[in-house]
Amino acid sequence: MEEQARPPGRPAASATLQGSAHPGGAASTATAAALSFSSVATVTLGNQSDAGRPEAAGSRGPAPLLWHGAAVAAQALVLLLIFLLSSLGNCAVMGVIVKHRQLRTVTNAFILSLSLSDLLTALLCLPAAFLDLFAPPGDSGPWRSFCAASRFFSSCFGIVSTFSVALISLDRYCAIVRPPRDKLGRRRALQLLAGAWLAALGFSLPWDLLRAPREPPAPQSFHRCLYRTSPDPAQLGVAYSVGLVVACYLLPFLLMCFCRYHICKTVRLSDVRVRPMTTYARVLRFFSEVRTATTVLIMIIFVMCCWGPYCFLVLLAATRQGQATQAPSLLNVAAVWLTWANGAINPVIYAIRNPNISMLLGRNREEGYRTRNMDAFLPSQGLGFQARSRNRLRNGCANRLGACSRMPSSNPASGSGGEVVMWARKNPVVLFFREGPPDSVMEVGKLHNSETRDSSI
């Protein structure tokens, strides 16, 4: 009688297969497929928290060990690739911005904050993932504090990255949509950056360790501690977890979409209303703003794709209210790795959108650059050469950019020439973002009275 009163336990895999009414039916096939996917996911995850239990260790045969080793090697290779791209790429971006004074603009300050947060994520969070791959299963033991610190850094720098991209979108919105007097100044940019870092620090503090837990924490493995969603709804409550996701991720995502929508609307209206462009500085500025807006759009898409699954899992854990008692699934691991991969994707975007980045890294201001940026070259030349270069650039833009096809050409022979490539010795190429063309370039555009007015942004 006592045995009949005991609550039924979870049936074994073999019992599940044998207990189906029709062994050859659809239910048996679906169950077998689910069990096969579960076994593959268990091997792929590496050091699972359930691997430390005796029944799990005894069921592992020699064949799964080979798959386990291959899975660990593949995971280590992916983590190494993310680490190298994040560390080296973001160091290069930060070095370019800090090295050249002309690149120290307001938008590049937000880029610097984004690169710094991605670099710190690679240096302080990825080592814990490497340790999890090769650490023995079982209780985390002495690594419990290291695991909590890694989760804190991952959450803090992730929030900073999201805020930085939102600030970049806001800066581009003010530069393109709003009047020039509404642009973000350096002082306001520093205040926004300081507020973003302080807010990320406050939201990411391990409040579950500073307050008395609702229930004694159960022993957990290093893998379960590392890939547990942060914040944990089981420890901090559902309201806090949902509020953090909304304030730190969903609202910045909405701000990015709002800014991007108005930027696209303004660019489309400007493309329709603009007259034939006759000033090369206006041409450069217009297409520079469009290219910048496209780069920001690419960054926004990758941020949403990398952080969207993580936010969804946090909200899902909040609805279940049982995160602390569950082992991290394959989706948890993939979501955390996607957030880390976002820091490696951003430098790749910069390199693709700015192919001359190696020249900025290899040369200083005194040595000069081989550049297509006329703004960096013409101010150091005479007025006669500036007038001739203006005509050549005008014809080059007419060939490359269809919007400039109606510009008058004073040098037909140069119309078939390729891109204008100069050697600039004074000013570096503004690869990332700039606030507007230099004053000396605008003075060149004022040589003719008919070129002083333009309706482009």
Swiss-Prot record:
Q: Which UniProt keywords apply?
A: Cell membrane, Endosome, G-protein coupled receptor, Glycoprotein, Membrane, Receptor, Transducer, Transmembrane, Transmembrane helix
Task: Kindly give the PROSITE patterns that the UniProt entry links to this protein.
Answer: G_PROTEIN_RECEP_F1_1 (PS00237), G_PROTEIN_RECEP_F1_2 (PS50262)
Q: Which residues lie on this side of the membrane: Extracellular?
A: 1-64, 131-156, 211-235, 317-329
Top-level division of the source organism's lineage: Eukaryota
Query: Where do the segments described as Disordered lie?
Result: 1-26
InterPro entries (alphabetical): GPCR_Rhodpsn, GPCR_Rhodpsn_7TM
Q: Cite the ranges annotated as topological domain Cytoplasmic.
A: 86-109, 178-189, 257-295, 351-457
Q: Which residues are glycosylated?
A: N47
Subunit details: Interacts with MTNR1B. Interacts with ARRB1 and ARRB2 in a spontaneous and agonist-independent manner; leading to the internalization of GPR135 in the endosomal compartment.
Q: What does this protein do?
A: Orphan receptor. Has spontaneous activity for beta-arrestin recruitment. Shows a reciprocal regulatory interaction with the melatonin receptor MTNR1B most likely through receptor heteromerization.
Please give the name of this protein.
Answer: G-protein coupled receptor 135
